[in-house]
Each structure stands twice: as C-alpha cells, then as structure tokens.
Amino acid sequence: MSEYTLENIAQVVEILREKSPLTHCITNVVTVKDCANAVLAVGASPIMANAPEEAEEIVGISNSLVINIGTLTKEQIETMKKSAKFAIENNKPFILDPVGVGISNIRNQTPIDIITNSKPSIIRGNLSEIKAIAMMYDILDECTMAKGVDVAQCDIINKDTLISNCNLIKNISEKLNTTIAVSGPIDIISDGHDVYTIENGDAMMSRITGSGCMLGCVLGAYLAVTNPLEAAITGTLVMGIAGELAAKTARDNNKGTGSFGIYLIDELSKLNKSTILSQSKLNKM
Amino acid sequence: MSEYTLENIAQVVEILREKSPLTHCITNVVTVKDCANAVLAVGASPIMANAPEEAEEIVGISNSLVINIGTLTKEQIETMKKSAKFAIENNKPFILDPVGVGISNIRNQTPIDIITNSKPSIIRGNLSEIKAIAMMYDILDECTMAKGVDVAQCDIINKDTLISNCNLIKNISEKLNTTIAVSGPIDIISDGHDVYTIENGDAMMSRITGSGCMLGCVLGAYLAVTNPLEAAITGTLVMGIAGELAAKTARDNNKGTGSFGIYLIDELSKLNKSTILSQSKLNKM
Amino acid sequence: MSEYTLENIAQVVEILREKSPLTHCITNVVTVKDCANAVLAVGASPIMANAPEEAEEIVGISNSLVINIGTLTKEQIETMKKSAKFAIENNKPFILDPVGVGISNIRNQTPIDIITNSKPSIIRGNLSEIKAIAMMYDILDECTMAKGVDVAQCDIINKDTLISNCNLIKNISEKLNTTIAVSGPIDIISDGHDVYTIENGDAMMSRITGSGCMLGCVLGAYLAVTNPLEAAITGTLVMGIAGELAAKTARDNNKGTGSFGIYLIDELSKLNKSTILSQSKLNKM
C-alpha cells in the first residue's frame, strides 16, 4: 500500500536498462515483432517461443512471462497453459493480456483456465476486456460486447466515468487478487488497495495495431524488476509518454500512422529518467 | 452495370472512415501486421484470427472477410474453409487473395475449394495468379508459371497487352461469376460486364513485401460498405495513389524501400476525398 | 582456397540484383517480414512457406533455402527436415540459422538432425550458438549458455579474443565440413581453410530484433549466385555496411531504434558496388 513517486518510477526505468532481464512473450503473430522491439527499446531482452515442447525450458531461463491471446492456435493454448503453470510454480511473475476476450469461446476459456489455475501478477486490457473477465467471474452482471479486439464505444474511459470505473477496477482487482491495468484515454491501475490513473498517451495509439500488445510486453519486462503495481504504473507511463511524444513528432512533420508507429519505438528507446520526471501525468486516487 | 465516377469513389472512401466496419483477415504471417495497419489507415477496424475453433464466431461479428493463402497451414486451411462457408451462408461479403496459386498443390486446392463451395465477392491477384485460377476452371488452356509469389515476367501488364488482358479478365470474371481485380503496372478490374483500368501506383510497390496483401485487405474493408465492383475500384485506386505519393516522398528524400513501406501507410492514413479527386487515373474501357 | 577481393564481392552484389533468384525462407514469425524485405532490398525474390505439404514443391522452384529455427512448431520442424533433405538431394544450397540453440531440446535436436542428414552450405549464428553446435558434435568440451536468443556476455568477440576465436571457428568449420559465419562486433567467417574477419556493423544492430535473421536470409540470397564462402563474406559485409550507415543516419537525426530498423532496409536497398568498395572492412587472417 506504499505510494509510488515519479522518482521511484524513474528508478525502475533505469534498473530495467541495467539488468536487461529476459522477458518471454507468448504472443500473437500480428504484432510480435513490435513487441520484441518494444521490449528491447525499454532495455530488456525479449524471447518469443510458441512450442509446447519447449515451454518449461524457456520459462525456466526467463525472468518474466507475457501471455497475449491475440491469435490463438490449439498448440499455442497448450504452450500458454504449461508456461503459466510452470511460471507460478517457479515464482516467475507473469502478465495476461486477454485480447478479444468475450468475442469467442476459446478467447474466454483460455484466460479463465490461466487465471484460475495460475494466478497472473497483472491482467491488462481495455475496459471491455476487463469487464468481460469480471463477468465470467460473476463480479459484474453484464458488459457490452467489444468491437472485435477494440474497446466498445461506451467503454472508453473519460472524465465523467472515471470515478465509477476506478471503483469498478479496484473491486475487480480485489476479487481476482491480482493487479489490473486498464488502458484508455485515461488509464486505470489498481492492486485492489490503491488506484492510480494516468493521463499520458495520444489518440493516435489506437490508429495503429499493437499499442496494447506492446504495452503488455513492456509491463512484462518491468515485472522482472519490481512488484506488479509498480511495474504496471511504470510501463503504462512509459508507453503513454512515448506515444505522446511520437504523436507530436508525427503531427509536426505531417506524417501519418506508419511513421507514428516507428517514432513510438524511437521514443521508447530514448526515454530516460528525466523524460519520466518531466512528462508523467500520474495521479493517485 | 452502372458507371462509377470519382465522386462515387470519394464518397466510399469517406463512408468507410465514418462506419469503421470490422474487417476480418485470415492472412499470412509475413505481412499480417501491415495488413492490420493498412485496414486501420483507411478507417476500418481489423481483426486477425486463425483458429478453426473460433472461425464462425469471428466471421459472425465481422462485416467482411479476407482470405489470403500466403503461408498456409493445415489448421489455417480448415479455418479458411469454415469461414468462407459461414460467410456465404450469412451474406457476409468476402475476398479471396490466392497468393502463389499455381506453385503448389495446397495453393491450388484451397482456392478451388473456396471458389467452388463459397463463391467469393472478389478474387484479386497478379495476372499469373488469376490465369492459374482460370486454367484450373478450364477457362484458359495454358498459363506461365509464376516466379514464387511474384508475377511471371511475361504477365506484367503493359500498353501492348492491355486490351487482350482486359478481354481475358472480363471473360474470367463472367465465367466465375465474381469480380476480378488484377494488379500490375496497369490494374484491371471487371465484374464480367464492365472493365475498368487504373494507372496509379509505382514500381517501388513491388520492391517491398505486402503491397498485394495490403491491397487485398483494403478491398475487404471497402467490401463492407459497397458492392464488389465499386469496392475493388475504390481500394485499388486508394492503394495506387498512396503508393505513388509514398514513392515520391521516398525519392525526394533519397530514402530506400524501408521508408517507402512506412510512407505507404502514412499516405493511406492521410488520404481523403480531395486526394481521390485530384490523383485518380481511372478509365472505363 | 582463393582470395576474395572487394572487386569480387562488389560483383556478387551486382549479380544478385541482375539474376534476382528465388530465395525460400522457412523462418520465425517475429522477423519474417523484415527477412522478406531484406531479401528484396538486396535484389532477390523471397518466398516464405511453412507447410510440410508443399515443402518439396517450394524448394523445387527455389534457387536457395534458409532455415531459421527462431519460433519452431511441430509442423514447421517437419517442413524444415523435408526441405533440407530435398534441397541436398537436388543440389540446392541452403543455410541454417540455429537461433537459440542450446536453450531447449527442440532447438538442439532440429539443427542436429538437419546438419547430420542434410549438410548445410553455411551455418550462421552468434558465437554462443556456434559453440553450442560445436559442443553437440564433441568439437568443444564446454560452452556458456546463451541469454535466450542473444549471445552470452563472455562470447562477444573483441580484439583480445579474436585470434583464438578465429582458430576455433576454422576448426569447427573443418570438422563440420561447412562454411561457418559468426556475427558479433567483429564477424568471423571460415570455410575450414581460410578465415576472414569483418569489422563493419554497429552496436545498434543488437538493439533491434531481426538483425541476425535478416543476415541469415541475405546470406541465403547470395548463396544462389556464388559459393558458400563468398556468399557468407558478401552478405556479412552488405549487412554490416548497411547497419553502419543506418546507425549514422539515426544518430545524426536524433532518432531511436525504430527509425534505425527502417533505415537499415533503406541502406540495403540503396547499396551498390561503390558502397562496397569504399566502406568494407574485410581482412583475411
């Protein structure tokens, strides 16, 4: 229940660059390269492996694990379950990114299996995804169906819905006994006790594929060097600030979404202590 | 058999940005991220899913479907067949991009199965691919083998071969009872009645991977908001114009093919009504 | 045992652009698009296919083959074995890139099977990977475990360890009867008789994913037009020079690793005879 200052966060950013932990990402085929480059850009060392035959060996040498269900296959689901189980048995922290949960049966069953059998350190997603998870655990009675892998229109967090959503996320986090990181125009992070909001970021982030997936992998990298709540705050700030700076560069140079995606990795790779201290819009509720 | 004006096309471009339909792409692992970013750039919302277990659920929530056979696996072939069948039964338009048809048995059998059992709204490809399809349906007696996934040298459409190729494409389109979109230095599009040609584009587009795949997915996005012929014309114009503008920027700044690929997404994301009206080189034959 | 001059190398660079051979890459899902774009950038024509059902057909039409084990699946392992066997039976040169060998059982068994049953023309990797291969063939008694898919700290080649590592690589190459290309701050290439070192490149190359994978595919492209030793020297010089120029552009413009990755493809696509002659840092030991 400690309070995290920007000084703490800036330190975590630097520690990751010093320690360069091995971050294992079992993720989708759409954005896997951007995920690897994002992990490298913030200073960690990524590995991506999908075969169930090597699941335990790879988790065994890794410092943390990311599970992103964006493009599941039967084989990958097996790898995810084995990896999550092995991670929890060996005290390796891991994050679950339940992309598109709520829109198909395997996108519901895979997260349920992983959450129930191998409690993740962090679950991250957009509000529609987190609500879909909450509904499956009877924490919520109803939720709006997401638009594919994107958030439902009514689940976009704004000033008016912030307080109620903060309470909701705190409640879900407490019930599931895990840290929850929700991304949106305003990000909400809770460990069931405290709630933080972050107002960094830019709307351009939702005009490219991979912003959410990269965030999940960056959180996974920070999980290797600090506790889940601080990892979630740090990674969300880092991605939000990088997104903001990248969008500014894209607009200033009359570029579109292609260049924005490249500038985002640029900013992640250049980001340091002073960027965190000067740019962060972090609030404790 | 209506005639499409640039005003019509420009309207379709704007309608896609307003409606942002969900475009489901079952596509190859090489260019899948560029496909998602291209769909986002023109204003639609992409989803990529490969598991047969969720095929019907994902098609069920999507507004249109793209099937690209670039890197087939046994599992993905099953997903494609189920998805195409479900799409046709539920009146969801879909486009088939038979990448490399003619070079292997599974690249022949998969399109045949899909075309025969679940008529696509559009089939798009380079001339070698479309001729390979035509030969399998006894519309053509012979064709030149493509160079891998690239067009055969003798199948590059130019001024001299334009008329005969237009007649050929119209004939194939009529026989297969579907819209055909052939890309090349001059693009040819026919619904079996009318034939349109487009002279936008740049040779640099064939020096990166994914130009054809992105085109297929962009056509798929427009399929969600208009009829196959207009969708094919609109998407082909949009990609061609974006390619032209991106190549100019790359050359003006002494950049190579890496930057060109990024500028292409930039231009897709910036393209609007006035770009269409001022840049289009569309002819009705 | 001939000596390769920069004139020879520059000629190979030009011949690849003229002949544009079909280069088949069975590679990982992380960097597959960059691999295709790198192959296109140096002038060859890439094809990527993973299904065992079409393995022999695709190798049959290809001029050379690349096998990269970065993200193995059961199906892909089958494709690799069939493809390697068919390549060797049909005198198609191929290169093996044993990504992460030493860190899991399938990453050990797959290269062993391929090396033993279908001798590759080139094996390329970082020093940790090549040492792991050597240990499995009893050429070395011990080696340091790599850090995931990255080189172990103690295996980074520098001035002090250069001579001993050159001798080691020459020995491994002789014993395995294949050309070995080791990448690092100083690259070492040997065919068991001669040893060449290359000091081009930039540290930024290890801050993005895919530098090694792209190198493997570029070597594969050159394998289609010359012998393994000259192909390895040419491809390593080409990638190193492109990396150096790209890093300079990134630094001069205060860009990060995202832009660097794009500039790398730019430089590969612009590289010509005069770049080779003016920039190469090639030494025969």
Swiss-Prot record, chains A, B, C:
The record's annotation in SUPFAM superfamilies points to: Ribokinase-like (SSF53613)
According to the UniProt record, what class of enzyme is this? transferase
Reported EC number(s) for this entry are: 2.7.1.50
Locate the residues binding substrate: M48, G210
List UniProt keywords, sorted A-Z: ATP-binding, Kinase, Magnesium, Metal-binding, Nucleotide-binding, Thiamine biosynthesis, Transferase
Instruction: Name the Gene Ontology biological process terms.
Output: thiamine biosynthetic process; thiamine diphosphate biosynthetic process
Q: Which Cys-Cys disulphide bridges does the record give?
A: none
**Catalysed reactions, as listed in the record:** 5-(2-hydroxyethyl)-4-methylthiazole + ATP = 4-methyl-5-(2-phosphooxyethyl)-thiazole + ADP + H(+)
Which Gene3D superfamilies does the protein's record reference? 3.40.1190.20
Necessary cofactors: Mg(2+)
The UniProt record gives the binding positions of ATP as R124, S183
- List GO molecular-function terms, semicolon-separated: ATP binding; hydroxyethylthiazole kinase activity; magnesium ion binding
* Pathway(s) the chain acts in: Cofactor biosynthesis; thiamine diphosphate biosynthesis; 4-methyl-5-(2-phosphoethyl)-thiazole from 5-(2-hydroxyethyl)-4-methylthiazole: step 1/1
Give the superkingdom in one word.
Archaea
Job of this protein:
Catalyzes the phosphorylation of the hydroxyl group of 4-methyl-5-beta-hydroxyethylthiazole (THZ).
- Give the family, as the similarity comment puts it: Belongs to the Thz kinase family.
Q: What is this protein called?
A: Hydroxyethylthiazole kinase 1
Organism this protein belongs to: Methanosphaera stadtmanae (strain ATCC 43021 / DSM 3091 / JCM 11832 / MCB-3)
Q: Which gene encodes it?
A: thiM1
